Amino acid sequence: MKFFLDTANVAAIKAINELGVVDGVTTNPTIISREGRDFETVIKEICDIVDGPISAEVTGLTADAMVEEARSIAKWHDNVVVKIPMTTEGLKATNILSKEGIKTNVTLIFTVSQGLMAMKAGATYISPFIGRLEDIGTDAYQLISDLREIIDLYDFQTEIIAASIRTTAHVEAVAKLGAHIATIPDPLFAKMTQHPLTTNGLKTFMEDWASFKK
C-alpha cells in the first residue's frame, strides 16, 4: 500500500518525507488556498521534495476549460497528476486527457457507479471520500471493497486513492480492504506512529538502562 500526504504545506511535507514512508502528495483548491501562495510555485516545490505522483486540481467547470488547464498544469513537472472532478464534464475531460497520456485523478467519488464511470473514461486514479460518506451515514468501507473488486475483476489499470481520511482506523480499514493508496493529512501521520504503551515502554527501558549504568 502507498501513502500520500494530503497537504500543500511545504514545511510539513519536508518533515514527514524524512520518515521514508511518503509515496506522493494530493492537493485541492481548498488546501492550496490555505497556504496563501502561488499555485504553480507550491506544486513545483512539492515535486522537488517528493519523488512520486503529485495531484493538482483544475478549477474549470467545462470539459474544454478543464482540458486547457490540465495541459498547462501537466507541463509543470513529470510527476504531476491532474485532479478532475467527478462530473459529466469531468469525464469528458478525463477521456481526452487519458488519450494524450496525461495522468488524472478523478475526485469526489461517492458511489460505485461514479468510480466505474471514471475507470471507463481512463482515470489513472479515483478518489472515494471516506469521512464525508460516514458523515451522511453511508458505508464508505463497502465502497472501497466494491471498487477494488471491480478493478480486479475487469483488470482496470486505475488505482484507488482513499481520501477524506480522518483517523488511524480509517487508514487501517482501507488498507485491509485493498485500497492502493491512502492520502493522509499531515497531523494524522504523527498519530500513526504513537501509542501510550510505546511511550511508557520506552520510558521504562531508559529508566532501567540508567539504573544499570550507575
Curated annotation (Swiss-Prot):
Molecular function per GO: aldehyde-lyase activity; transaldolase activity
Please tell me which top-level EC class this enzyme sits in.
transferase
Q: Does the keyword Transferase apply?
A: yes
GO cellular component terms given for this protein: cytoplasm
Q: What reaction(s) does this enzyme catalyze?
A: D-sedoheptulose 7-phosphate + D-glyceraldehyde 3-phosphate = D-erythrose 4-phosphate + beta-D-fructose 6-phosphate
Q: Which InterPro entries match?
A: Aldolase_TIM, TAL/FSA, Transaldolase_3B, Transaldolase_3B/F6P_aldolase, Transaldolase_AS, TSA/FSA_arc/bac
**Alphabetical keyword list:** Cytoplasm, Pentose shunt, Schiff base, Transferase
- Segments spanning the bilayer are none
**Which residues does UniProt mark as catalytic?**
K83
Which CDD domains does the record associate with it? Transaldolase_FSA
> What is the documented function of this protein?
Transaldolase is important for the balance of metabolites in the pentose-phosphate pathway.
The family this protein is said to belong to: Belongs to the transaldolase family. Type 3B subfamily.
Name of the protein: Probable transaldolase
Instruction: Please report the organism this UniProt entry assigns to the protein.
Output: Streptococcus pyogenes serotype M2 (strain MGAS10270)
